[in-house]
Amino acid sequence: MLILSRKTNQKIFIGDSIELTIIEIRGDQVKVGVEAPRSVKIFRQEVYEEIQRENRAASDSPWSPNSLPQLPV
């Protein structure tokens, strides 16, 4: 893991298209601004972990399309 120290308003660049800006430092909390292409998915850790849990639960579900009633055509 690369560890970098930054002060307020300083930036970190990741590749050519992602820019992180330290917006504010207050106590043990840091506000970070992220500029990235829309195609880059960015999640807070707790949100990402919840998405992963939901995906695992959905894939473990015994549901199948065959369990739906047939609609008349």
From Swiss-Prot:
Q: Where is this region: Disordered?
A: 54-73
List localization entries. Answer: Cytoplasm
Keywords linked to the UniProt accession: Bacterial flagellum biogenesis, Cytoplasm, Repressor, RNA-binding, Translation regulation
PANTHER family (UniProt xref): CARBON STORAGE REGULATOR
Which family does the record assign? Belongs to the CsrA/RsmA family.
Please describe the quaternary structure of this protein. Answer: Homodimer; the beta-strands of each monomer intercalate to form a hydrophobic core, while the alpha-helices form wings that extend away from the core.
Listed name of the protein: Translational regulator CsrA
Origin species, per record, is Treponema pallidum (strain Nichols)
Q: Write the lineage as a comma-separated list.
A: Bacteria, Pseudomonadati, Spirochaetota, Spirochaetia, Spirochaetales
